[in-house]
């Protein structure tokens, strides 16, 4: 079938030019499944098309479009609509925000609207801009997706969209791959100068609750047995964490390591070398890191708040209320003392069944199959 007789689907991939992040994982996982459908032609657009080709491969039903405009606002307002017109696109898929000029059907995935339920964790101007641009984008779109039942419900509540299908994040196959734990721990120790460590991978911002871990780490005297390792980009200042950290004895500070932003390869190494993964976030639209840790066979404890309440049926006693410090300490101490009590292999099977890109792609494909040229 020739490409001009197929349904043409445009996918905005500008996030692939900005380094590793959750939205990139979502687009990559979703469309690696969807491009298997040869009845549709997919147009992936970004500044670095060589990077896109390395990720999605060369297929007859895939075209890579280069963004020659790097200004984000002009690109959204005019350049994307021009590309859509030029290539006769039937459906375009965006994340959070869509162009106001509309020349085809729009799909938008709004991953969360946490700034509405947890405004204290977001700058005021950012909240206002996000609210109005998300709301306008949702109204302009023919279908609005989200990534969890929790996020879907909040998009419905705050943006006034009656039906928000869920396209759940999947876990990349690389996390399920077998590996030698002793070897990974040795490599992590050599590369990062860390050993026998508790790990938290997440961006730095107040709602991520890093301060909860460091406080319990000190009060439970876990520094006598473990290092505490953080990894993630600094998004918003966490003054509560900084204030507490500065009060710690130097001997304890030496046991707290911040690796900062890591490449995917280094992140995977740090994860595989961990003794215990801890995820105390207060609010998430999905919350994928604890699932990735479980998939990698790492004993994991997690917050049970917001979207992470979906994990309770299989994580059970290894979850906690991130706003209840004593409850968190109890779960952390139990897991740190006996991480082998967490049945990682059983949990891994649950993750593989519940969170895979085939399920998410099926939801999007169902909508695409209703679209006529």
Give the location of each predicted region.
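Carbohydrate transferase catalytic cores enriched for Leloir-type hexosyltransferases
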Residues: 2-373
């Amino acid at each position: 079938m020739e490409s001009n007789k197929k349904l043409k689907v445009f996918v905005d991939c500008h996030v692939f030019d900005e380094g590793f992040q959750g939205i990139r994982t979502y687009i990559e996982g979703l469309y690696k499944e969807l491009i298997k459908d040869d009845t549709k032609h997919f147009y992936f657009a970004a500044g670095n098309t060589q990077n896109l080709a390395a990720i999605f491969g060369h297929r007859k039903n895939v075209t890579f479009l280069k963004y020659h405009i790097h200004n984000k606002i002009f690109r959204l307002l005019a350049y994307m609509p021009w590309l859509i017109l030029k290539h006769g696109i039937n459906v375009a898929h965006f994340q959070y925000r869509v162009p106001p000029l509309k020349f085809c059907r729009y799909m938008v995935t709004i991953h969360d609207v946490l700034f509405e339920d947890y405004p204290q964790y977001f700058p005021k101007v950012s909240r206002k801009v996000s609210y109005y641009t998300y709301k306008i984008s949702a109204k302009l779109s023919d279908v609005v997706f989200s990534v969890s039942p929790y996020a879907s419900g909040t998009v419905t509540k705050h943006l006034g969209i009656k039906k928000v299908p869920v396209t759940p994040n999947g876990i990349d196959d690389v996390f399920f791959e077998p590996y030698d734990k002793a070897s990974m721990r040795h490599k992590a120790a050599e590369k990062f100068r860390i050993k026998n460590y508790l790990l938290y991978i997440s961006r730095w911002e107040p709602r991520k609750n890093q301060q909860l871990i460091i406080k319990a780490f000190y009060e439970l005297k876990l520094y006598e047995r473990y290092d505490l390792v953080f990894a993630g980009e600094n998004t918003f200042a966490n003054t509560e964490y900084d204030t507490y950290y500065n009060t710690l004895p130097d001997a304890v500070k030496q046991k707290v390591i911040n690796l900062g932003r890591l490449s995917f390869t280094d992140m995977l190494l740090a994860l595989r070398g961990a003794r215990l993964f801890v995820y105390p976030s207060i609010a998430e639209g999905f919350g994928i890191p604890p699932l990735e840790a479980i998939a990698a066979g790492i004993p994991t404890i997690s917050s049970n708040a917001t979207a992470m309440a979906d994990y309770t049926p299989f994580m059970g006693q290894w979850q906690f209320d991130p706003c209840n410090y004593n409850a968190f300490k109890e779960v952390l101490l139990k897991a740190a003392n006996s991480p082998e009590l967490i049945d990682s292999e059983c949990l891994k099977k649950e993750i593989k069944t519940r969170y895979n890109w085939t399920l998410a792609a099926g939801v999007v494909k169902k909508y695409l199959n209703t679209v006529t040229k």
